[in-house]
A protein has these predicted regions:
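C-terminal helical cap/extension that packs against the catalytic core
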Residues: 372-423
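Nucleotide phosphate-binding/pyrophosphate-handling subdomain across enzymes
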Residues: 2-9, 19, 23-30, 252-254, ...
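NAD(P)-binding Rossmann-fold cofactor-contacting core
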Residues: 31-47
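Glycine-rich Rossmann-fold phosphate-binding loop(s) that bind the pyrophosphate
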Residues: 15-16
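Short acidic low-complexity segments
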Residues: 54-66, 417-420
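Beta-strand->loop->alpha-helix junctions that form or flank phosphate-binding loops
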Residues: 37-38, 56-59, 95-99, 140-143, ...
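Structural motif
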Residues: 9, 69-70, 178, 214, ...
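Phosphate-binding loop of NTP-binding sites
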Residues: 3, 12, 26-32, 49, ...
Length: 430
Protein backbone atom coordinates (compact mmCIF):
# COMPACT_ATOMS: atom_id res chain seq x y z
CA UNK A 1 0.00 0.00 0.00
CA UNK A 2 1.25 3.49 -0.85
CA UNK A 3 2.22 5.27 2.41
CA UNK A 4 0.34 8.39 1.27
CA UNK A 5 -2.94 6.67 2.04
CA UNK A 6 -2.57 6.89 5.82
CA UNK A 7 -0.92 10.30 6.26
CA UNK A 8 -3.13 12.63 8.30
CA UNK A 9 -0.48 14.77 9.94
CA UNK A 10 3.00 15.52 8.53
CA UNK A 11 5.97 17.51 9.83
CA UNK A 12 8.78 19.07 7.75
CA UNK A 13 12.29 19.83 9.03
CA UNK A 14 13.50 22.52 6.64
CA UNK A 15 10.02 23.45 5.42
CA UNK A 16 11.22 26.72 3.87
CA UNK A 17 13.35 25.00 1.23
CA UNK A 18 12.07 25.34 -2.30
CA UNK A 19 11.48 21.60 -2.74
CA UNK A 20 10.16 21.03 0.77
CA UNK A 21 7.71 23.92 0.55
CA UNK A 22 6.21 22.45 -2.64
CA UNK A 23 5.59 19.17 -0.80
CA UNK A 24 4.12 21.03 2.17
CA UNK A 25 1.73 22.81 -0.18
CA UNK A 26 0.77 19.50 -1.77
CA UNK A 27 -0.22 17.94 1.55
CA UNK A 28 -1.97 21.13 2.63
CA UNK A 29 -4.22 20.95 -0.44
CA UNK A 30 -4.94 17.30 0.39
CA UNK A 31 -6.39 18.24 3.78
CA UNK A 32 -3.43 16.87 5.74
CA UNK A 33 -2.33 18.75 8.87
CA UNK A 34 1.03 20.31 7.94
CA UNK A 35 3.59 21.98 10.19
CA UNK A 36 7.34 22.41 10.23
CA UNK A 37 10.60 24.00 11.24
CA UNK A 38 13.00 26.23 9.38
CA UNK A 39 16.06 28.16 10.45
CA UNK A 40 15.05 31.58 9.14
CA UNK A 41 11.78 33.34 8.24
CA UNK A 42 11.55 34.20 4.54
CA UNK A 43 8.96 35.44 2.09
CA UNK A 44 8.29 31.79 1.24
CA UNK A 45 7.68 30.75 4.86
CA UNK A 46 5.46 33.83 5.24
CA UNK A 47 3.37 32.58 2.33
CA UNK A 48 3.14 29.09 3.83
CA UNK A 49 1.89 30.55 7.11
CA UNK A 50 -0.74 32.56 5.21
CA UNK A 51 -1.84 29.29 3.61
CA UNK A 52 -2.53 27.83 7.06
CA UNK A 53 0.73 25.97 7.77
CA UNK A 54 2.22 26.33 11.25
CA UNK A 55 5.98 27.05 11.23
CA UNK A 56 8.51 27.76 13.99
CA UNK A 57 12.12 28.87 13.72
CA UNK A 58 13.82 27.36 16.78
CA UNK A 59 15.38 23.89 16.91
CA UNK A 60 12.97 22.96 19.71
CA UNK A 61 11.44 19.50 20.16
CA UNK A 62 8.59 20.97 22.22
CA UNK A 63 7.22 22.61 19.09
CA UNK A 64 7.03 19.40 17.05
CA UNK A 65 3.44 18.35 16.44
CA UNK A 66 3.35 15.09 18.39
CA UNK A 67 0.41 13.90 16.28
CA UNK A 68 2.59 13.83 13.15
CA UNK A 69 3.00 10.32 11.74
CA UNK A 70 5.58 11.23 9.09
CA UNK A 71 8.58 13.54 9.43
CA UNK A 72 10.27 14.76 6.24
CA UNK A 73 13.78 16.22 6.04
CA UNK A 74 16.33 17.12 3.38
CA UNK A 75 20.07 16.42 3.11
CA UNK A 76 20.61 20.12 3.85
CA UNK A 77 19.69 19.46 7.50
CA UNK A 78 22.84 18.73 9.52
CA UNK A 79 23.13 15.32 11.19
CA UNK A 80 23.46 17.05 14.56
CA UNK A 81 20.05 18.74 14.29
CA UNK A 82 18.22 18.30 17.58
CA UNK A 83 14.70 17.89 16.18
CA UNK A 84 15.85 15.44 13.51
CA UNK A 85 17.57 13.21 16.04
CA UNK A 86 14.64 13.40 18.44
CA UNK A 87 12.27 12.21 15.72
CA UNK A 88 14.61 9.39 14.71
CA UNK A 89 14.93 8.24 18.33
CA UNK A 90 11.25 8.43 19.24
CA UNK A 91 9.44 6.26 16.74
CA UNK A 92 8.50 8.77 14.06
CA UNK A 93 8.53 7.62 10.45
CA UNK A 94 11.44 9.82 9.32
CA UNK A 95 11.94 10.01 5.55
CA UNK A 96 13.77 12.15 3.01
CA UNK A 97 12.03 14.52 0.63
CA UNK A 98 12.94 12.19 -2.24
CA UNK A 99 11.03 9.32 -0.60
CA UNK A 100 7.87 11.41 -0.48
CA UNK A 101 8.24 12.39 -4.13
CA UNK A 102 8.52 8.69 -4.91
CA UNK A 103 5.23 8.01 -3.11
CA UNK A 104 3.48 10.82 -4.99
CA UNK A 105 4.76 9.90 -8.45
CA UNK A 106 4.92 6.11 -8.46
CA UNK A 107 1.31 5.69 -9.63
CA UNK A 108 1.20 8.81 -11.80
CA UNK A 109 2.29 9.60 -15.35
CA UNK A 110 5.50 11.35 -14.40
CA UNK A 111 7.60 13.85 -16.33
CA UNK A 112 10.90 14.39 -14.50
CA UNK A 113 13.46 16.99 -15.52
CA UNK A 114 17.02 16.50 -14.24
CA UNK A 115 20.36 18.16 -14.91
CA UNK A 116 23.12 20.04 -13.16
CA UNK A 117 21.69 23.28 -14.53
CA UNK A 118 18.67 24.40 -16.54
CA UNK A 119 16.23 22.06 -14.85
CA UNK A 120 14.25 24.64 -12.85
CA UNK A 121 13.33 26.81 -15.83
CA UNK A 122 12.71 23.77 -18.05
CA UNK A 123 10.47 22.17 -15.41
CA UNK A 124 8.55 25.39 -14.84
CA UNK A 125 8.09 26.02 -18.55
CA UNK A 126 6.96 22.43 -19.15
CA UNK A 127 4.41 22.62 -16.35
CA UNK A 128 3.22 26.00 -17.63
CA UNK A 129 2.71 24.65 -21.16
CA UNK A 130 0.68 21.73 -19.81
CA UNK A 131 -1.39 24.02 -17.61
CA UNK A 132 -1.90 26.84 -20.13
CA UNK A 133 -2.79 24.43 -22.96
CA UNK A 134 -5.43 22.65 -20.89
CA UNK A 135 -3.53 19.36 -20.82
CA UNK A 136 -3.25 19.65 -17.04
CA UNK A 137 -0.68 18.53 -14.49
CA UNK A 138 0.41 18.56 -10.89
CA UNK A 139 3.65 20.53 -10.61
CA UNK A 140 6.52 20.36 -8.12
CA UNK A 141 8.98 23.09 -9.09
CA UNK A 142 12.42 24.10 -7.89
CA UNK A 143 11.61 27.80 -8.19
CA UNK A 144 8.69 30.22 -8.02
CA UNK A 145 6.92 30.38 -11.39
CA UNK A 146 6.28 34.07 -12.05
CA UNK A 147 2.98 33.41 -13.84
CA UNK A 148 1.47 31.83 -10.73
CA UNK A 149 3.58 33.04 -7.80
CA UNK A 150 4.10 29.50 -6.52
CA UNK A 151 6.25 26.38 -6.84
CA UNK A 152 3.32 23.95 -6.68
CA UNK A 153 -0.09 23.44 -8.15
CA UNK A 154 -2.49 20.53 -8.31
CA UNK A 155 -4.81 19.16 -10.94
CA UNK A 156 -7.32 16.32 -11.08
CA UNK A 157 -5.34 14.72 -13.91
CA UNK A 158 -2.91 12.06 -12.70
CA UNK A 159 0.08 13.69 -14.39
CA UNK A 160 3.05 15.01 -12.42
CA UNK A 161 5.78 17.36 -13.63
CA UNK A 162 8.65 17.30 -11.17
CA UNK A 163 12.14 18.72 -10.90
CA UNK A 164 14.48 15.77 -10.33
CA UNK A 165 17.34 16.79 -8.03
CA UNK A 166 20.67 15.04 -8.53
CA UNK A 167 22.01 16.18 -5.16
CA UNK A 168 22.42 13.21 -2.80
CA UNK A 169 21.27 11.03 -5.74
CA UNK A 170 17.69 11.95 -4.85
CA UNK A 171 16.51 11.62 -8.46
CA UNK A 172 17.16 7.88 -8.36
CA UNK A 173 13.99 7.52 -6.25
CA UNK A 174 11.87 8.51 -9.28
CA UNK A 175 10.61 6.27 -12.08
CA UNK A 176 9.47 8.69 -14.81
CA UNK A 177 7.52 8.02 -17.98
CA UNK A 178 9.30 10.95 -19.61
CA UNK A 179 12.78 11.88 -18.40
CA UNK A 180 14.74 14.94 -19.46
CA UNK A 181 18.43 15.58 -18.85
CA UNK A 182 19.51 19.18 -19.39
CA UNK A 183 23.20 18.96 -18.40
CA UNK A 184 25.69 16.58 -16.80
CA UNK A 185 28.52 18.96 -15.94
CA UNK A 186 30.44 18.07 -12.78
CA UNK A 187 28.71 19.42 -9.68
CA UNK A 188 28.06 18.37 -6.09
CA UNK A 189 31.50 16.80 -5.98
CA UNK A 190 31.23 16.91 -2.18
CA UNK A 191 28.71 14.08 -2.67
CA UNK A 192 29.92 12.33 -5.82
CA UNK A 193 33.66 12.70 -5.44
CA UNK A 194 34.45 12.63 -9.17
CA UNK A 195 32.95 13.75 -12.47
CA UNK A 196 32.77 10.08 -13.49
CA UNK A 197 30.47 9.33 -10.56
CA UNK A 198 28.19 12.19 -11.63
CA UNK A 199 27.88 10.66 -15.12
CA UNK A 200 27.29 7.22 -13.64
CA UNK A 201 24.40 8.57 -11.57
CA UNK A 202 22.74 10.11 -14.62
CA UNK A 203 23.06 6.77 -16.37
CA UNK A 204 21.33 5.14 -13.41
CA UNK A 205 18.61 7.78 -13.65
CA UNK A 206 17.86 6.72 -17.24
CA UNK A 207 17.58 3.12 -16.02
CA UNK A 208 14.65 4.26 -13.86
CA UNK A 209 12.56 5.27 -16.88
CA UNK A 210 9.45 3.12 -17.11
CA UNK A 211 9.13 0.58 -19.92
CA UNK A 212 8.20 2.22 -23.24
CA UNK A 213 9.07 5.59 -21.77
CA UNK A 214 10.90 8.53 -23.33
CA UNK A 215 14.31 10.07 -22.69
CA UNK A 216 14.97 13.59 -23.98
CA UNK A 217 18.57 14.66 -23.41
CA UNK A 218 20.60 17.67 -24.37
CA UNK A 219 22.60 16.97 -27.51
CA UNK A 220 26.21 16.21 -26.68
CA UNK A 221 25.67 14.97 -23.14
CA UNK A 222 27.60 11.74 -22.82
CA UNK A 223 27.03 9.24 -20.04
CA UNK A 224 26.18 5.51 -19.81
CA UNK A 225 22.67 4.92 -21.21
CA UNK A 226 20.65 1.73 -21.47
CA UNK A 227 18.44 2.45 -24.50
CA UNK A 228 16.33 -0.71 -24.14
CA UNK A 229 12.55 -0.22 -23.88
CA UNK A 230 12.64 3.54 -24.35
CA UNK A 231 12.64 6.15 -27.09
CA UNK A 232 15.63 8.48 -27.02
CA UNK A 233 15.59 12.02 -28.43
CA UNK A 234 18.06 14.89 -28.26
CA UNK A 235 17.55 18.64 -28.20
CA UNK A 236 19.79 21.67 -28.61
CA UNK A 237 19.73 25.40 -29.16
CA UNK A 238 20.87 25.25 -32.80
CA UNK A 239 22.62 21.93 -33.43
CA UNK A 240 20.94 20.58 -36.62
CA UNK A 241 21.80 16.99 -35.69
CA UNK A 242 19.59 17.17 -32.61
CA UNK A 243 16.07 15.69 -32.82
CA UNK A 244 14.65 19.03 -31.62
CA UNK A 245 16.52 22.24 -32.40
CA UNK A 246 15.96 25.89 -33.23
CA UNK A 247 16.58 27.75 -36.45
CA UNK A 248 16.21 31.30 -37.77
CA UNK A 249 16.68 32.88 -34.34
CA UNK A 250 16.06 36.63 -34.12
CA UNK A 251 15.96 39.20 -31.33
CA UNK A 252 12.91 41.43 -31.81
CA UNK A 253 12.07 44.15 -29.27
CA UNK A 254 13.96 42.33 -26.53
CA UNK A 255 12.31 38.96 -27.18
CA UNK A 256 13.52 35.89 -29.04
CA UNK A 257 11.73 34.60 -32.12
CA UNK A 258 12.67 31.27 -33.67
CA UNK A 259 11.47 28.16 -35.45
CA UNK A 260 11.49 24.79 -33.71
CA UNK A 261 12.56 21.92 -35.93
CA UNK A 262 11.32 18.53 -34.72
CA UNK A 263 11.16 14.98 -36.15
CA UNK A 264 7.74 15.55 -37.73
CA UNK A 265 8.07 19.10 -39.00
CA UNK A 266 8.63 22.71 -37.95
CA UNK A 267 6.84 24.97 -35.48
CA UNK A 268 7.24 28.43 -36.98
CA UNK A 269 7.64 31.79 -35.29
CA UNK A 270 7.88 30.78 -31.66
CA UNK A 271 8.20 33.82 -29.39
CA UNK A 272 9.98 33.64 -26.03
CA UNK A 273 9.64 36.72 -23.84
CA UNK A 274 12.49 35.72 -21.58
CA UNK A 275 16.16 36.65 -21.75
CA UNK A 276 19.10 34.32 -22.24
CA UNK A 277 20.02 32.05 -25.13
CA UNK A 278 20.15 29.21 -22.61
CA UNK A 279 16.44 29.79 -22.07
CA UNK A 280 15.84 29.31 -25.79
CA UNK A 281 17.40 25.89 -25.28
CA UNK A 282 15.30 25.28 -22.17
CA UNK A 283 12.21 26.20 -24.19
CA UNK A 284 13.28 23.71 -26.85
CA UNK A 285 13.30 20.92 -24.25
CA UNK A 286 9.92 21.95 -22.83
CA UNK A 287 8.36 22.11 -26.29
CA UNK A 288 9.84 18.71 -27.13
CA UNK A 289 8.02 17.24 -24.14
CA UNK A 290 4.76 18.92 -25.12
CA UNK A 291 5.02 17.66 -28.70
CA UNK A 292 5.67 14.13 -27.42
CA UNK A 293 2.47 14.41 -25.41
CA UNK A 294 0.54 15.39 -28.53
CA UNK A 295 -0.32 18.93 -27.47
CA UNK A 296 -1.43 21.19 -30.32
CA UNK A 297 1.41 23.28 -31.79
CA UNK A 298 -0.51 26.54 -31.61
CA UNK A 299 -1.34 25.96 -27.95
CA UNK A 300 2.33 25.28 -27.28
CA UNK A 301 3.31 28.55 -29.00
CA UNK A 302 0.71 30.50 -27.02
CA UNK A 303 1.97 29.00 -23.78
CA UNK A 304 5.64 29.71 -24.50
CA UNK A 305 4.85 33.32 -25.46
CA UNK A 306 2.93 33.80 -22.20
CA UNK A 307 5.63 32.28 -19.98
CA UNK A 308 6.96 34.96 -17.63
CA UNK A 309 9.88 32.98 -16.27
CA UNK A 310 10.98 31.91 -12.82
CA UNK A 311 11.97 34.10 -9.91
CA UNK A 312 15.75 34.65 -9.88
CA UNK A 313 16.23 33.08 -13.32
CA UNK A 314 17.18 35.93 -15.67
CA UNK A 315 14.65 38.04 -13.79
CA UNK A 316 14.55 41.70 -14.77
CA UNK A 317 14.47 43.86 -11.64
CA UNK A 318 15.10 47.15 -13.44
CA UNK A 319 14.62 47.62 -17.17
CA UNK A 320 14.85 51.16 -18.50
CA UNK A 321 16.19 52.69 -21.69
CA UNK A 322 19.71 52.99 -20.29
CA UNK A 323 19.90 50.75 -17.20
CA UNK A 324 19.09 47.07 -16.67
CA UNK A 325 19.35 45.02 -13.47
CA UNK A 326 18.98 41.24 -13.83
CA UNK A 327 18.76 38.82 -10.91
CA UNK A 328 19.86 35.24 -11.57
CA UNK A 329 20.54 32.20 -9.39
CA UNK A 330 23.49 31.02 -11.51
CA UNK A 331 25.97 29.30 -9.20
CA UNK A 332 27.91 26.96 -11.51
CA UNK A 333 30.46 28.11 -14.13
CA UNK A 334 28.32 26.83 -17.01
CA UNK A 335 25.28 28.66 -15.64
CA UNK A 336 27.31 31.85 -15.31
CA UNK A 337 28.56 31.44 -18.86
CA UNK A 338 24.99 31.02 -20.11
CA UNK A 339 23.91 34.09 -18.15
CA UNK A 340 26.71 36.27 -19.52
CA UNK A 341 26.13 35.04 -23.08
CA UNK A 342 22.42 35.73 -22.74
CA UNK A 343 23.02 39.26 -21.53
CA UNK A 344 25.53 39.93 -24.32
CA UNK A 345 23.05 38.66 -26.93
CA UNK A 346 20.47 41.22 -25.79
CA UNK A 347 22.84 44.08 -24.93
CA UNK A 348 25.95 43.58 -27.07
CA UNK A 349 27.27 47.14 -26.72
CA UNK A 350 26.61 47.80 -23.04
CA UNK A 351 28.94 47.63 -20.04
CA UNK A 352 28.29 44.57 -17.89
CA UNK A 353 28.87 44.73 -14.14
CA UNK A 354 28.51 41.33 -12.51
CA UNK A 355 27.78 41.02 -8.79
CA UNK A 356 28.41 37.39 -7.83
CA UNK A 357 28.10 35.46 -4.59
CA UNK A 358 29.73 32.00 -4.74
CA UNK A 359 27.50 29.23 -3.39
CA UNK A 360 29.17 26.59 -1.16
CA UNK A 361 32.81 26.39 -0.14
CA UNK A 362 33.21 22.98 -1.80
CA UNK A 363 31.84 24.16 -5.15
CA UNK A 364 34.01 27.27 -5.07
CA UNK A 365 37.08 25.13 -4.44
CA UNK A 366 36.20 22.42 -6.98
CA UNK A 367 35.13 24.81 -9.75
CA UNK A 368 37.54 27.69 -9.09
CA UNK A 369 39.24 27.50 -12.50
CA UNK A 370 35.90 27.60 -14.30
CA UNK A 371 34.61 30.50 -12.22
CA UNK A 372 37.80 32.49 -12.84
CA UNK A 373 37.57 32.00 -16.61
CA UNK A 374 33.87 32.86 -16.88
CA UNK A 375 33.83 35.78 -14.46
CA UNK A 376 36.64 37.37 -16.46
CA UNK A 377 34.20 37.78 -19.37
CA UNK A 378 32.38 40.59 -17.56
CA UNK A 379 33.52 44.22 -17.71
CA UNK A 380 33.52 44.59 -13.92
CA UNK A 381 33.06 42.02 -11.14
CA UNK A 382 31.97 42.55 -7.55
CA UNK A 383 32.33 39.42 -5.43
CA UNK A 384 30.48 38.76 -2.18
CA UNK A 385 31.53 36.41 0.63
CA UNK A 386 30.74 32.74 -0.07
CA UNK A 387 27.21 31.66 0.86
CA UNK A 388 27.81 28.52 2.96
CA UNK A 389 24.31 26.97 2.90
CA UNK A 390 24.76 23.55 4.52
CA UNK A 391 28.57 23.71 4.77
CA UNK A 392 31.22 24.69 7.28
CA UNK A 393 34.12 26.85 6.04
CA UNK A 394 37.05 25.17 4.29
CA UNK A 395 40.43 26.62 5.32
CA UNK A 396 41.91 28.79 2.58
CA UNK A 397 38.70 28.90 0.53
CA UNK A 398 37.08 32.31 0.12
CA UNK A 399 36.01 34.64 -2.66
CA UNK A 400 39.59 35.90 -2.75
CA UNK A 401 40.79 32.75 -4.53
CA UNK A 402 38.65 33.88 -7.47
CA UNK A 403 39.50 37.56 -7.20
CA UNK A 404 43.25 37.05 -7.31
CA UNK A 405 43.26 35.23 -10.66
CA UNK A 406 40.44 36.95 -12.56
CA UNK A 407 41.72 38.94 -15.54
CA UNK A 408 38.84 41.43 -15.58
CA UNK A 409 40.12 45.01 -15.37
CA UNK A 410 37.95 46.15 -12.47
CA UNK A 411 37.26 43.75 -9.61
CA UNK A 412 36.64 43.80 -5.88
CA UNK A 413 35.35 41.75 -2.95
CA UNK A 414 32.61 43.32 -0.86
CA UNK A 415 33.49 42.22 2.67
CA UNK A 416 30.10 42.86 4.23
CA UNK A 417 27.14 42.03 2.03
CA UNK A 418 24.35 43.49 4.14
CA UNK A 419 22.83 46.71 2.78
CA UNK A 420 25.92 47.54 0.77
CA UNK A 421 24.89 45.17 -2.02
CA UNK A 422 21.56 46.89 -2.50
CA UNK A 423 23.17 50.32 -2.36
CA UNK A 424 25.83 49.29 -4.87
CA UNK A 425 23.23 47.91 -7.29
CA UNK A 426 21.20 51.09 -7.00
CA UNK A 427 24.34 53.14 -7.64
CA UNK A 428 25.11 51.14 -10.76
CA UNK A 429 21.57 51.62 -12.06
CA UNK A 430 21.41 55.37 -11.55
Amino acid sequence: MNPLTNIKNIYFIGIGGIGMSALARYFNTQGVVVSGYDKTPTALTDDLVKEGIRIHFEDDINQIDKAATVVVYTPAIPASHYELNYCKDNGYNVVKRSDVLNWITENAFTIAIAGTHGKTTTTSMTAHILRHSGYGCNAFLGGIATNYGTNFWSHEKNVVVVEADEYDRSFLKLAPNVAVITAVDPDHLDIYGTAEEVLKAFGQYTDKIKSNGVLIQKYGTEFPINTANKEVFTYAYKEPKASFHTSDLKVIDGSYQFDLVHPKGIVNNVVLNMGGLHNVENATAAMAIALQLGIDENKIKEAVASFQGVKRRFEFKIKTANKVLIDDYAHHPEELNALISGVRSLYPNEKMVLVFQPHLYSRTQDQAAGFIEILSKADEVILLPIYPARELPIPGVSSDILLDKMTVAKKTVMRSEERRVGKECLRLCR
